[in-house]
Amino acid sequence: DIELIREHIDVIRSCNIDILELGFRSLINDQYKGPLAFTRDDFLEKFDSKNLKIAVMVNIKEFENHNEIKNKINRLFPFDSNNSKVDIIRLACTYEEIDKVKVAYQLLKEKGFEICINIMHGAFLDFKTLKDIANSLKKLPLSAIYLADSTGSMDSIEYNSKLKILAQETNFDIGIHAHNNLGKALDNTLSSISIGSSWLDATILGMGRGPGNTDIEELLISLTPKYRKKINIIPLINHSKKWFEKLKEEHKWGKNRFYFLSAKYKIHPSFIQTMLTDSRYSTAEIIGAIDYLKNDKSRTFNSQKLLKARTFFEGKPRGQDIPKHKIKQERVLLLGNSEGILNFKDKLEEFITYENLYVIGINSKSYISQELIDARVFAHPMRLLADNNLFELLNQLIITPYSMLPEKIKLKLKNNNVLDYGLEIERGSMESLKNYCTIPSPIALAYTLATLGATNVKNIMLAGFDGYPKGDIRNQEVENIFDLFRKKYEKINIYSITPTNYFNVSSKSIYGFNL
């Protein structure tokens, strides 16, 4: 939004802030992103940035090898500093990318730009590594060297001790880029001033991916008495209310219990952000994923690692039971978790009793009488760990990959009747083998259908599978599961007896059966 950016520049300038980092400078263009993902010079020409230094960030990981650095730098910055609206370039890198950042620095310095280097993953760097970094960079006339706490897991004591190493080993200005996972971004930023930090990063309302960063309103309020500078922050607060409050509501940055845990275990916040914005993840599954990721050195985001964390099973796929030996009925009613099922509670209970149906519930929710449910399915171990009512299910068969569960969850099931059927995750696949199945994703519905595929069932009725509103892309994952099932198990009839928005599921009405 041009109006937002123009007003933003004016407000930042009015607060006597020295530098405004407007966005990234990047060559990656594999999905739609706004103009500040690229922050090109022709875009910057639209704005008056007089009396304000404009900075952009470049992520060194874009340079996959040394041979392409010069070409990419020239494409990213075709003009020298005299012909560009950019004053300062911040190069973000990891310890492993120091050699590349030095090459990029030299090329950009020749173009006349001020350069800062932003060292990421500060919580993972010990004193020796920080000294190595400082010694490697200290001959470069940098404007500043930053230490970023990418996982937001450091307190002020640890942060200051590491910043002090950089200050002692170089003559550079020191910068701090704090993340707010633990709610300590402001405290860490203010505390760093005592050891000489002079480049203090902050954003309006703490805006930033996931837990966010230091809140600039709070930082300015805290700094005003210290520096005896009268700063009128009313325009900043008005600007924040006009634009950023609704952005925060939309993008939901800011600390919460999940980001707090990620900081404690030094897990990259993008794992948490991805799960929080994906409706498929329940609270139990997020906690389970964190429990997995904390042991897997998850300082950088990886989508495949997240899929593995979502599964959370131990070892190769295996089980001890053959489903058809424990589920012998030919007609099964599968109960979903949609609250719409409450509209049919009485009718369903009457229908189940009259038809003498074998009833399987997904997880532990109960919208009908417990006595009418024969079995329950748990495809994710954290569903079991989170459920404190399993003792009530002693008369219900628990269908789960028992042999693949962690020991602490096995103990929880010691008094339950269990069908131990293993599972393996393989995209685009559904297959029922002797004592384990292959399914496309760790979803209880997929596991249930694959388990039933290993029995002699002929009819599967669905109730409580309302789905999302028509057109919602979240329906696609479930619809893909139904497609895979129908193709693999052509002889099994499957249909819903309550309303559903899944377009590829046949429907009948519960009211149309003869009672």
Residue positions per predicted region:
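Catalytic cores and adjacent flexible loops of soluble metabolic enzymes
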Residues: 1-321
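Metal-ion/cofactor- or nucleotide/acyl-coenzyme-handling active-site neighborhoods
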Residues: 317-515
